[in-house]
């Protein structure tokens, strides 16, 4: 059998392209902003993870330019060898102070961070326990580890406790959860998770990719939002969302961080974050520290959008109705209908993300919308009017 045979077989992607509703790989001709030029037309951007709008902040852009001029385009090596810049150490030190965790390890991407952390810490004697709606990179890390994975229904604390009860006393256990769930926009039930972890002697890791810059004191994230910074053992996060760059990190105790530095194959055998990305992440972090009003503005706009959508008759996923996060999923139920309305909304000048399984639970299809602190109410009204026109009036 030819290993490429699967490549020539019929697929959903081919069907969608033939039907004219294929929703992926639209090309931008502009910066990532609240309005973009995409395929030659102005479109309101409601699909970006640029939550604080810092990809175009002058101080962040200038930091990237300066790093390119000083260090060149890349580090040409692993952090383990020739790929560590002073700037990497500076970023890790400043991030550690901001997150109040002394041990920071930076990775090339957020995906790589989850894979690298979990595969280093979880061995064949350990259990890793996951919310079913965790990000795909968490599951990739679990698969790369030699541990036993248990999953519990989304935010179901009774089922989490049953999973913990299955772990023998002689084995270690790591509970891993998104802080803010990337598709649903809801927040993990962290107080209950931490209480159960304490009861059963487990450790807690929070993927805060969508929580940093969004929740908590000064944007410190989900644990800060709940006042549980001392009870979460590991934070994982990215530089590609609120911090307007590329890369990821782990924040933990210095002992745990040092172990991961020396045991994580994705960290050891990958090139380090390029100079421009390192510099822009550091500049964005400093910008956030200097402008603590940005997360609050983001929350205001997110609540404004939730109310505006509900008032216009759009059906928001129940778990996200009151969450103070910039991710708002709209139910659309059926795959082809979702792709058709997403295309119509796009043609009318608004970019949103149609979200299908496996990114969502089986049987659940959504339009994922997301917001920036630099949006305006007027721009959101324009976008919501267009979406309501398509989703409510045209499809009643």
Report residues per predicted region:
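Structural motif of enzymes handling amino- and sulfur-group chemistry
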Residues: 272-291, 297, 310
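Active-site PLP attachment segment
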Residues: 224-259
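Active-site phosphate-binding strand-loop segment of PLP-dependent enzymes
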Residues: 150, 154-206
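Conserved PLP-anchoring active-site segment centered on the Schiff-base-forming lysine
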Residues: 117-136
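Conserved PLP-binding catalytic core of the aspartate aminotransferase-like
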Residues: 296-303, 310-349, 359, 364, ...
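N-terminal "arm"/small-domain region of PLP-dependent enzymes with the aminotransferase-like
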Residues: 5-73, 202
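Conserved N-terminal alpha-helix of the aminotransferase class I/II PLP-enzyme fold
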Residues: 62, 66-110
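PLP-dependent enzyme catalytic core of the Aspartate aminotransferase-like
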Residues: 3, 58, 62-66, 70, ...
